[in-house]
């Protein structure tokens, strides 16, 4: 373990998440690269960070699954230290289609990954960051989308609705934990 600040970036094996993980590492954070399926991509990001002198681990966890989220945070606690920053970035998007063509399985998968996953990760971060639980505070960033405001008709309103829920989660949680030295933003 080290004395660096610790950042967990969910869904950071590629794209925005990978770039965010590298940015935090460049700024001196010990980083957890979280991934669901693509171990080789996540490990490549982690190795790049380590090759640049950073501290990084890659941890597989499906953020829509409560046990996986608990294991993710416990692993970070033991290998890097207590989380200082959580970036909720993991999310899924499916083929564009109209609502009448969407199955309940599709809608539930989007909501489990994009909403429940953020709730679970926020919960575990707050347990560790909150001054009410002996923490020193921290930062939670929930990655949202402009689709939350446009609704994305004829494309993916299920995804848009999930991001609207994230905006509401962020607003409510930011007020709930502000006095505990935790900042929450989109």
Region roles according to the model:
Residues 70, 93-108, 127, 131, ...:
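Conserved mid-core segment of classical short-chain dehydrogenase/reductases
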Residues 39-40, 60-72, 104:
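The beta1-alpha1 cofactor-binding region of Rossmann-like NAD(H)/NADP(H)-dependent oxidoreductases
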Residues 93, 135, 141-165, 170-179:
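Catalytic loop of short-chain dehydrogenase/reductase
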Residues 27-44:
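Conserved glycine-rich Rossmann-like NAD(P)H-binding loop of the short-chain dehydrogenase/reductase
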Residues 84, 100-119, 141, 159, ...:
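Catalytic Tyr-X3-Lys loop
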Residues 4-5, 54-55, 82-83, 129-144, ...:
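Active-site loop of short-chain dehydrogenase/reductase
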Residues 113-135, 174-175, 179:
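Amphipathic alpha-helical dimer-interface segment in Rossmann-like NAD(P)H-dependent oxidoreductases
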Residues 13-14:
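Conserved glycine-rich cofactor-binding loop
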């Amino acid at each position: 373990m080290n004395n660096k600040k610790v950042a967990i970036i969910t869904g950071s094996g590629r794209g925005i998440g990978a770039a965010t993980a590298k940015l935090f590492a460049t700024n001196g954070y010990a980083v957890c690269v979280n991934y669901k399926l693509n171990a080789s991509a996540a490990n490549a990001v982690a190795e790049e960070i380590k090759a640049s002198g950073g501290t990084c681990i890659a941890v597989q966890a499906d953020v829509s699954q409560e046990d996986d989220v608990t294991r993710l945070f416990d692993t970070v606690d033991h290998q890097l230290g207590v989380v200082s920053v959580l970036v909720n970035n993991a999310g899924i998007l499916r083929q564009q289609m109209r609502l009448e063509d969407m199955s309940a399985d599709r809608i539930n998968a989007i909501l489990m990954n994009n909403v429940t996953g953020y709730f679970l990760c926020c919960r575990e971060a707050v347990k560790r960051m909150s001054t009410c639980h002996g923490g020193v505070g921290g930062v939670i960033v929930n990655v949202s989308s402009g689709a939350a405001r446009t609704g994305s008709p004829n494309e993916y309103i299920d995804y848009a609705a999930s991001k609207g829920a994230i905006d509401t989660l962020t607003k409510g949680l930011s007020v709930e934990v502000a006095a505990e030295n935790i900042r929450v933003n989109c």
